[in-house]
């Protein structure tokens, strides 16, 4: 997808947004196409959502925040405002997140009809230049919001299919080509003050979520980052050394989780050298990045390896100025790939797996949430979560930037999340 460009003239900007809108909506439909109606309503755990709900909720976002601002617009179905509101308390009550799997109605076809109807209304307004500047900023946010749900649709259906006793595949694609991972090397940086974060949007022309702002200075100590993320083979060494059998390198809550949940290896692994993928069970590639780790597992591995997780400032310092290139949903592999064996540079900063950091998800100094209902988007979740950076094989490339902050609780395992090592230097 091409980036939004600040073209001259309000009407021309809206045409650019029209193209991005159509591309984004089409990708969601393509990702959902392999799902049967039964697949699309499964909710395998409270943290996940049915595919049908993702399709409807992203549509509700455009209808609720863009179309309903037009007094002439007629709501598709007023009852659906309750069903497909996620967490916007200022908008009204909502169906419980953990109960989304009971929504056998509306049907998948009705949800598709809903998407089509809203798309017609949105495209008419964008084509005719009938949205003011404020509405166009919400369109841009809605596109970014839908890209987030594209990744969640994939990770949620992967968990649902794995939870099915038959463990069917989402699709049947050829296995991605294996690459011999480069030798792990360290890239050292001296102590310095660095500036991280993004300029506030929409005051800035470049989109960024409110949790990425404001730009601010951070003292970063002398440290080194690994040139690539940790591989399956390296994580297997941790397992073979008894990593899941002793509390030694685990945080207290992490070890309690290992015991309570019976963790013995990353999610989707088995003991026979296989892993469950969106293409079904596959032989585990030893050179591919280890994924589906919780922060607890990533942290325990780093301690075992005599290292630590990078801070988000260290990660952003390394990623600033680096092109957003890698293995994303755009490549259609839908599985992490090994880094190419090269001698220089830091690899895999973008794509393949989200990288857990050692930074709690907290507001930056001077953080200000967006005004109105959209102020609920990020800020109210800034507790008991950790920052991840870089995107994954399920993230759209155009969604990412060096300042992007993802966040999940310490025990979350169903995302494409891995680990890059860091260490302090004297």
Model-identified regions with their sequence ranges:
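Functional-site microenvironments in short loops/helix caps that host divalent-cation chemistry
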Residues: 142, 146-148, 152, 156, ...
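Disulfide-stabilized, aromatic/cysteine-rich ligand-recognition loop
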Residues: 1-49, 53-121, 125, 133-140, ...
């Amino acid at each position: 997808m091409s980036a939004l460009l600040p073209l001259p003239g309000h009407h021309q900007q809206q045409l650019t947004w029209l193209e991005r809108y159509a591309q984004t909506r089409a990708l969601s439909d393509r990702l959902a196409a392999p799902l049967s109606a039964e697949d699309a309503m499964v909710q395998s755990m409270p943290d996940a959502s049915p595919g049908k709900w993702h399709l409807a909720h992203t549509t509700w976002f455009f209808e609720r925040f863009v179309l309903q601002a037009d007094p002439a617009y007629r709501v598709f179905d007023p009852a659906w405002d309750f069903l497909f509101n996620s967490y916007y308390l200022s908008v009204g009550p909502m169906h419980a997140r953990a109960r989304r799997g009971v929504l056998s109605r509306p049907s998948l076809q009705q949800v598709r009809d809903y998407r089509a109807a809203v798309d017609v209304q949105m495209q008419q307004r964008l084509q005719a230049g009938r949205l003011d500047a404020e509405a166009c900023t919400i369109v841009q946010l809605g596109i970014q919001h839908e890209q987030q749900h594209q990744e969640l649709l994939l990770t949620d259906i992967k968990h649902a299919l794995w939870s099915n006793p038959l463990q069917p595949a989402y699709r049947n694609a050829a296995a991605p080509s294996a690459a011999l991972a480069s030798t792990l090397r360290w890239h050292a940086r001296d102590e310095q003050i660095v500036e991280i974060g993004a300029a506030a949007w929409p005051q800035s022309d470049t989109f960024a979520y409110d949790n990425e702002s404001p730009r601010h200075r951070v003292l970063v100590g002398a440290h080194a980052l690994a040139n690539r993320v940790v591989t399956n083979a390296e994580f297997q060494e941790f397992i073979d050394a008894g990593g899941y059998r002793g509390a030694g390198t685990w945080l207290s809550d992490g070890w309690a989780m290992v015991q309570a949940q019976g963790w013995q290896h990353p999610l989707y692994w088995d003991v026979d050298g296989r892993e469950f993928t969106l293409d079904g069970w596959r032989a585990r590639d030893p050179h591919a990045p280890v994924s589906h780790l919780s922060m607890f597992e990533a942290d325990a591995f780093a301690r075992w390896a005599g290292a630590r997780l990078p801070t988000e400032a260290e990660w952003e310092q390394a990623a600033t100025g680096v092109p957003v290139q890698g293995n994303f949903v755009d490549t259609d592999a839908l599985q992490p790939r090994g880094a190419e064996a090269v001698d220089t540079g830091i690899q895999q900063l973008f794509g393949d797996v989200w990288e857990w950091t050692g930074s709690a998800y907290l507001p930056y100094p001077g953080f200000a949430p967006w005004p109105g209902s959209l102020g609920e988007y990020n800020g109210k979740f800034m507790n008991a979560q950790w920052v991840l950076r870089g995107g994954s094989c399920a993230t759209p490339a155009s969604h990412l930037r060096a300042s992007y902050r993802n966040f999940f609780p310490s025990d979350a395992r169903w995302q494409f999340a891995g680990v890059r090592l860091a260490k302090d230097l004297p």
